[in-house]
Amino acid sequence: MLKPNNSWMWYFDLKDNSLMLDLGSDMVFRVGIPAKHLIPSASEQCEFTVDDASIFQNYKENVSHLEISEPRKAELALNAVAASRFHKPMMPKSWFFDTQSVSCDPENSDIVTLQTPLGMAKFIVIENSGCASLCMMVDVEPLALSSTKEIRFCDTIKVMNNRITAYEEDAILNLALVG
């Protein structure tokens, strides 16, 4: 997986209308967040900071156990760093998701699940603002939000925390067999 260094640079590509991350060695990452969801400072060139590297490491560790390919994990972690630094504030769109009976207060970089009447998917928490969280989808398969709308890998959505469930891997994987 990628290892951040002090040569990485954020910049905005006007031709592609996209935030980019120059990774050095002729490698460039195109951030998956639409330009309309980025704060104005995303259009200015700036370095990938020590804070960015620390946040990247947290995301990388929390997605390491997910059943997606290593390149997808790197893509997810880089998009999550970009979202944590450059995503505009947004209003919750909780109506797509089912209210949960158990309250959840997720931490940044936690893996959580959200359920619609049409399915369920895993997300990573980008920012918990108290009663709502900005989340990024981690599942590769799209999740139908309604009959006409879906959310895809690395798309972001803000939801009230009462719609979020903590993600738990199969309990069987966490149990030790005895005797």
Swiss-Prot record:
Keywords, alphabetical: Cell cycle, Cell division, Cytoplasm, Septation
GO CC terms, sorted: cytoplasm
Subcellular location: Cytoplasm
One Pfam family here: ZapC_N
Single GO BP term: division septum assembly
Job description of the protein: Contributes to the efficiency of the cell division process by stabilizing the polymeric form of the cell division protein FtsZ. Acts by promoting interactions between FtsZ protofilaments and suppressing the GTPase activity of FtsZ.
Family statement drawn from the similarity comment of this UniProt entry: Belongs to the ZapC family.
Subunit architecture: Interacts directly with FtsZ.
Protein name in UniProt: Cell division protein ZapC
